[in-house]
Swiss-Prot record:
It comes from the Eukaryota. The lineage of its organism: Eukaryota, Metazoa, Chordata, Craniata, Vertebrata. This is Diphosphoinositol polyphosphate phosphohydrolase 3-beta. It is an enzyme of class 3 (hydrolase). Substrate binds at R9, K17, K18, R19, S38, S39, R40, R89, K90, H91, R115, K133. Keywords: Cytoplasm, Hydrolase, Magnesium, Manganese, Metal-binding. Nudt10 and Nudt11 code for identical proteins, which gives their indidual characterization difficult. Thus, most experiments do not discriminate between the 2 proteins. Residues 144-164 are annotated as: Disordered. Belongs to the Nudix hydrolase family. DIPP subfamily. It is found in: Cytoplasm.
Amino acid sequence: MKCKPNQTRTYDPEGFKKRAACLCFRSEREDEVLLVSSSRYPDRWIVPGGGMEPEEEPDGAAVREVYEEAGVKGKLGRLLGVFEQNQDRKHRTYVFVLTVTELLEDWEDSVSIGRKREWFKIEDAIKVLQCHKPVHAEYLEKLKLGGSPTNGNSAAPSPPESEP
């Protein structure tokens, strides 16, 4: 564990920072996704998520992060996958699907850092994410391919093809 001013970073045994995020959808049709402005670059959009706290489960961390960053509550759905980022930082992010049921007018990050949120059609969200956060665009690409816990996990190798 390492400490940031307001947070304890947690790592898995392989040295990956443990993170959780949600693709927050306006409805169960999953055709509009909520993105939030980056805290570092307010003109860039990202998928809400962040580091897991000690003893926190991925699903609880995902719900907490979207509440803090996007000011939403909702119905937590499936685990879309576990995504690894190795280039600049070693992150392992559990990404869940959440259907939004409540939008808070003011929320923690809107008040403290002026964070914004906006609904995007899936294709538009992929375009805005690909420039600055390509791994976030991957979440939506997997969703478009019918991502669900039954068809694989981005961090796990694919099973070998069986011979006919």
